[in-house]
Amino acid sequence: FTAIITDSSSNSTTGTASGTTLAVDQTAPTISEQTVVTTPSNDTTPTFAITSNEAGAITVSQTITSPSPANAISGNTTIIFDTLAAGTYNSETVSVRDAAGNDSNTVTLTTFVIDTTAPSAFTVGSVITSGGNVVANYLNGTNTTVTVTVPIENDATLTGGTLQIQAKVTGQDFENIGSSATILEGNLGGTQSIALTDDNIEALTGYAEGTTVTFTAIITDSSSNSTTGTA
């Protein structure tokens, strides 16, 4: 901008325009959810990401710790929530305001669940050998399989979780034995059995003739909360 001053005798002077400009920006940023919060999860400081076509200041419906300061770049920006309580989050929003003060569209984040509750305490059930000459409470040279049965609580959060058997020789520490198994909906409120080979047993640290092997299990829910059973 500039100005012309004219006196009463019609003499005029045009002012200097230095420092009197306005940049015109009436276009709002456009943003979208680029990476959703992992769900369900026991992470109380979850992460998500947005894509913006402009840099600008981020506004989120919850407190965030990153980025700090809370500014988005043109492109993908990863955002980390401050500590959240356990629960279901279905109305969290994010927007961006550019340097000119234009506000973007408001994005509602995909619903996510934070679950910090571990599975209930449990006691490992039966341990039964099979193959060859079966004698209760013994693993002999003719046995080929040891089946460990574990009770599974009727808790929907366990569906998609895992069951891992552990074992130890007396005087040693518990260690994973065999592969973990996925807990299915049909296992809820019942039991789940894991078959171990004699080779699995013989690979335990300290295994030898005359030793005693103790079994336990770890149940982990779909949010990665875990509980170790009583042997």
Regions found by a protein language model. Name each.
Residues 21-23, 30-35, 49-51, 78-82, ...:
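Generic structural detector for well-ordered beta-strands
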